[in-house]
Amino acid sequence: MPIDPRSIARAWRHVLTNRMSVGYALALMLLSGALFGFIGSAQQIFVEHFGVGNRFGLCFAAVAGAMGLAGYLNSRIVERVGMRKVSHTAVIIFVAMAVLHLITALAGIETLAVFILLQMLLMGAFALTTSNFNAIAMEPMAVIAGTASSVQGAITQIGGGLIGAIIGQAYDGTTIPYSLGLAVCGSGALAIVAITERGRLFRGYHQPPATG
């Protein structure tokens, strides 16, 4: 089948002009930036700041394990509760934990145990948020799912990678820049979702789907 540039252009236009598609892709971009920031900063924070040495793998695994458990929990509750209720609640928890993280860092009372606990809660909320945000972004794109997935993925991964790099490069020997980065990313994602849904968090603003 020959490639039709006009069909491709129409599909791109649908993806980039649909409120749900763009809004949730941008929110995912910010949250992905937070994840990439964690991955890029984890060794410096755990090894240099907290001095965990060869326990780094265990510390990292604890946080990753929380994400895995949250993913399993999501699979059990999302059909009963709904994507929006799960993800909107989770992103609010993400913001709250990120702000608490920043406060403890600024106050100088953040121990290794506190850091790991807050990271587990943050990344658990991240897992509950992002899988559902991705599904919501794709919801009105069923007819052009392949193109939509490619465009949204590019926005999320490229933008998130750049944000994560900024967070990682901001490391100054403390957890303050990292915690601030997560708080900014989470707050930005929540604001974008609220605007996208016209303030109807947990219920949603329903835009007509793409028609091809």
Where are these regions (language model features)?
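Helix-to-loop junctions at the C-terminal end of transmembrane segments
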Residues: 70-85
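Pair of pore-lining "gating" transmembrane helices in MFS-fold secondary transporters
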Residues: 17-37, 120-121
